[in-house]
UniProtKB/Swiss-Prot annotation:
It holds the Pfam family C2_nem. Residues 350-362 have a biased composition (Pro residues). It comes from Caenorhabditis elegans. This is Uncharacterized protein R10E12.2. Transmembrane segments: none annotated.
Amino acid sequence: MRGALLLLVLLSAQHVSTSQFWLSVEVEQIDWTDGCLTTALCSHPRFQLIKDLLPVNEKVTMNWPIVEHFDKESHRPFVSYWPSGRTEDISMSAQVVGTDRTYGFPRICDQSPSVRIFPEEHKKIVAHLEKEKPTGKPPMDSLKIKVKGKCFNATMTVIKHTERCPWCPDPKEITIIGQEPGSEATGLRAGSAAWLFGSSSSLISDDRIVHIGVLVLAIVAVLSSTAFAIILVMYLRNKRLVKETLKKPRFHPYISVKGHEIAEDNCRYDLPWEQQQRPLTYWMTSSNKSSESTMTSPLDSASSLHGSGGSHQNPHMYNSHHHQHQQQQNAHPSEMYHSTYTRDGYQTYRPPPPSVHPPIFPPQTQLFHPPTYSTQRHVTSPNSSRNDDSGLESV
């Protein structure tokens, strides 16, 4: 039974010792030998501490320059972390390193032998002291060691931390304020309500600010996309309209309408030339007033003149014709222009008479022709025609 118990104790001790731990080393005092480093031909010396895990040959080093204020600088703690291993396998040594003054290569100017920090005997002593003076706190392993070289003697304090890191606070010393489960649920509800509707201390939280920013950016992106689409559609539409206007002629040919102007009282269509140059004949008129005064065309008047031949014109006839022409000119315009005539089924207004006055011929003198075979004087009357002579008298 005793052997089994010892085996269990050793296994438990080994399990505890192989867990992670921290080692903190603080240099308390260093004594230097005068002129030692000068005679050793070491330039730019530095004091260096080396921690070594012997089974795996893992080393952690730290050094300080040897200057005027070295005592103040060296009092800083040197903390090393070991994820696995035993504290009994940790050894420590001190060195003075620098460069050779003659050749300039790095060299070790002075060093001390390696010393185990926590040997097996020290562990037994600590366990015995803990039994004699039990305390509520877990044992904190700490001890002072001295290392000695040719030019220095150093005294250091080493502390082992197995439960927590040196800078971590003790959880037993932290005061924990308890909270009931009901109050916790009430606190969660109050927190959610404050996030939604805001609270007196903080109106909006960081999450709400992020959500609002994302929403604003989304709205700006949608508006920008809509405006761009509208501008693009308007541009394409204007471009199409410009192309259509370029295909069509801009200027239409100018057509003068002066030649086609028609007076209100004139005819509605172009009349033949013979109707424009002379008045209308009797059969084309329909008014009573125009039928009373018979108008003849210039051609008819000329034929009548030629028909009269050498006979003199009747003055009464000429005067009546002239009187009728004056009456026609003095007639009211409405009576002249409102007379209509029909031709080819179209009824239109009668055009005004020409403004050219008929020619006035001077009165002709009467000619007396003496007879050839008879002594009887023959006087031609004005009413006689030139065709009355059969031609026998003149022969």
